[in-house]
């Protein structure tokens, strides 16, 4: 099962072009932080970035990927893929130790074929979400294990702090789940344990905040609170609108067959007058409370937030997979032959269907011709660190896609510029990106320019002759 997950996550991982939202932004932040040797302040085009208002842990993860496999799309996404694998592994281990091998296998199968978890802004992209989902999962599984040993509660608190340092206020879901879990399970902690838990949750965040404050005071925190929390929660920003049915529709779009199987299993249990857990076992009762909260809390909080984005509910896929695995294993081991046969056929059909979707996706990367043209500068001699301008006949300032900014930086440390054609002519260390519909021979001859390279998207021009590397 792990081999299926590994294939789904890593096959052709570096062959897909970089996406502008949001992996390119994170990739630029990480690249520039690494180049400048500043691991605290994220920048975009070498200016402090007050649009991407996240603490630095996800940038550090991308930096690690760059260091391990190079400045390329694979380096951008490597740690996301590893975190997705780790999420599947810790889910499998938790379920195996508490519910048996079959439940573990089925949970792995479900999560390994969850299309949104794999291909939408998570496992196969350089976004912060895969790391966040891993830390979210680690936090809640540790919370569930704390019924056996209080030390796991502190692990949960520490995982929360790392989740906050990855995706900021999104980690609030973990804190809400922790609070409700302790309330509903009747857990009572001593003052000493409360203090220890709070230290585990807050100390890493406070250390980062103090260090960040040294650079720009409260400027980052003000934007982080006002825009990334209050504004995002109360107003649909950047066109991300939706009503109360939004995330239900998202789940049906990406997870319909697994949801149908889950609903069918719940109905079977109701008709058979069975229970999912032994009510006499308080440990099992704690597990079902935690798993239900893990699904319900993020779903409700994101439903009531005004800004709706489909990948916000990624953290609920691990608990859904766990619940499906546990229920399915109980039915397959205890129910009548007909019910077991129907369930097994349904599981195999769903897994086969979603695996087919994943196979289609990973085997058909959609090329981006503009990025491919920029990548061709890798073969040019002596242009590393050049400025890159974009030509427009009406002298408008260039608008750069974030994916183009990152590709330029990764390929040749090119610095994209917003200046017009005349700014390019004044710069001795510069290249000009020209879209094919704007290109004319007169543009080249009248300005004594050279065609450096080209493809079906357009041309790259220079004022000097540039050799191809041998």
Predicted regions and their residues:
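Extracytosolic helix-loop segments that constitute the early lumenal/periplasmic catalytic or substrate-binding loops
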Residues: 6-12, 26-50, 57, 64
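Transmembrane-lumen/periplasm boundary regions of multi-pass, lipid-linked membrane glycan transferases
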Residues: 26-32, 158, 162, 166, ...
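Transmembrane-helix motifs of polytopic, lipid-linked glycan transferases
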Residues: 78-99, 138
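Specific aromatic-rich, kink-prone transmembrane helix
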Residues: 90, 131-148, 320-323
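Transmembrane-helix signature of polytopic, membrane-embedded enzymes
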Residues: 91-114
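Membrane-interface transmembrane helices that cradle and orient dolichyl/undecaprenyl
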Residues: 97-99, 137-153, 328
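Hydrophobic/aromatic-rich transmembrane helices and adjacent perimembrane loops
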Residues: 306-332
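Short periplasmic/luminal acceptor-recognition loop of GT-C membrane glycosyltransferases, typified by
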Residues: 352-469
């Amino acid at each position: 099962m792990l081999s299926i997950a590994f294939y789904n996550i890593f096959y052709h991982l570096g062959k897909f072009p970089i996406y502008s939202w949001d992996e390119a932004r994170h990739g630029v932040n990480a690249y520039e932080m690494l180049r400048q040797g500043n691991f605290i302040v994220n920048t975009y085009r070498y200016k402090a970035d007050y649009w991407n208002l996240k603490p630095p842990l996800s940038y550090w993860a991308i930096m690690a990927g760059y260091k391990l496999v190079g400045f390329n799309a694979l380096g951008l996404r490597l740690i996301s893929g590893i975190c997705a694998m780790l999420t599947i592994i810790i889910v499998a281990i938790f379920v195996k130790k508490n519910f048996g091998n079959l439940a573990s296998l089925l949970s792995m199968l479900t999560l390994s074929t969850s299309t949104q978890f794999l291909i939408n802004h998570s496992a196969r992209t350089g976004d912060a979400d895969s790391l966040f989902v891993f830390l979210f999962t680690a936090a809640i599984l540790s919370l569930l294990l704390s019924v056996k040993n209080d030390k796991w509660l502190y692990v949960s608190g520490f995982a929360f702090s790392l989740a906050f340092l990855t995706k900021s206020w999104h980690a609030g879901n973990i804190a809400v789940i922790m609070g409700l879990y302790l309330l509903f399970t009747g857990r009572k902690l001593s003052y000493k344990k409360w203090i220890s838990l709070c230290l585990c949750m807050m100390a890493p965040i406070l250390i980062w905040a103090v260090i960040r404050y040294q650079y720009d005071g409260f400027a980052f925190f003000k934007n982080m609170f006002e825009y990334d929390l209050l504004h995002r929660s109360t107003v649909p920003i950047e066109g991300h609108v939706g009503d109360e049915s939004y995330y239900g529709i998202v789940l049906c779009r990406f997870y319909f067959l697994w949801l149908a199987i889950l609903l069918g299993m719940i109905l079977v249990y109701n008709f058979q007058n069975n229970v999912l857990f032994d009510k006499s076992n308080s440990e099992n009762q704690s597990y079902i409370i935690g798993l239900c909260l893990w699904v319900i809390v993020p779903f409700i909080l994101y439903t009531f937030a005004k800004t709706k984005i489909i990948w916000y509910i990624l953290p609920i896929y691990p608990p859904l997979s766990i619940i499906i695995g546990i229920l399915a294993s109980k039915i397959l081991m205890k129910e009548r032959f007909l019910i077991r046969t129907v369930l097994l056929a349904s599981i195999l059909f769903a897994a086969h269907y979603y695996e087919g979707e994943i196979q289609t996706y990973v085997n058909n990367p959609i090329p981006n011709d503009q990025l491919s043209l920029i990548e061709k500068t890798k073969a040019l001699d002596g242009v590393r660190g050049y400025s890159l301008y974009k030509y427009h006949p009406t002298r408008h300032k260039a608008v750069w896609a974030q994916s183009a900014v990152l590709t330029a930086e990764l390929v040749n440390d090119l610095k994209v510029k917003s200046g017009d054609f005349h700014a390019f002519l004044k710069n001795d260390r510069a290249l000009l990106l020209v879209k094919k519909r704007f290109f004319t021979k007169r543009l080249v001859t009248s300005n004594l320019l050279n065609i450096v390279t080209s493809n079906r998207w357009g041309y790259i021009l220079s004022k000097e002759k540039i050799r191809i590397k041998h």
